């Protein structure tokens, strides 16, 4: 690993949550992106080498592949394709990784989410920071603990609509 890679990893977006569920159940809930990120996801989100498609209107479209899965411990997804309607450099998310490190802590579990490669220098960083913070600290946490997250709904406004209004992306 060279110095540039180390710096990029250390500056990558990251959030840590603690949930009151066992690590294996936590792992299973994370893999169901429809339960906490978006009901409009197409494809499998829980099988290694499978690619799923996420979109929110024409504002954000991406294809993501699960590249590593260690039950109860770790999930790594790689962004294969990405398009944002509100930035110039469409390569910002391409080849970045969504990493979920899962650690048992007594009766609870710690989940550290890192979007490796999503760094403050990126044009999308502030919007993406807001989005991931909401999805990880609210929707994913609630989904793991109660079975009810707050994914972006198919047929009505949700968290993404709030973000689009806040950042003037409509």
Identify the function of each model-found stretch:
Residues 38-43, 60-107, 116-118:
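Hydrophobic-ligand binding "helix-grip"
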Residues 26-30, 52, 66, 77, ...:
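Hydrophobic pocket/interface hotspot
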Residues 10, 57-59:
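Glycine-centered tight beta-turn/hairpin loop motif at sheet-sheet or coil-to-beta transitions
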Residues 46-54:
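Short coil-to-beta transition motif at edge beta-strands of beta-rich domains
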């Amino acid at each position: 690993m060279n110095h540039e890679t180390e710096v990029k990893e250390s500056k990558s977006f990251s959030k840590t949550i603690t949930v009151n569920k066992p690590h294996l159940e936590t792992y299973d809930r994370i893999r169901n992106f429809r339960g906490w990120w978006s009901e409009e996801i197409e494809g499998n989100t829980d099988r290694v080498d499978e690619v799923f498609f996420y979109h929110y209107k024409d504002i954000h479209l991406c294809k993501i592949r699960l590249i590593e899965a260690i039950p109860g411990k770790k999930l790594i997804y790689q962004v294969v394709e990405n398009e944002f309607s509100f930035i110039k450099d469409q390569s910002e998310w391409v080849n970045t990784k969504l990493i979920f490190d899962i650690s048992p802590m007594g009766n609870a579990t710690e989940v550290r989410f890192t979007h490796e490669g999503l760094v403050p220098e990126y044009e999308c960083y502030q919007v993406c920071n807001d989005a991931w913070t909401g999805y990880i600290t609210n929707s994913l946490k609630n989904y793991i603990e109660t079975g009810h997250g707050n994914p972006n709904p198919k047929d009505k406004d949700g968290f993404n609509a709030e973000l689009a209004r806040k950042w003037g992306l409509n």
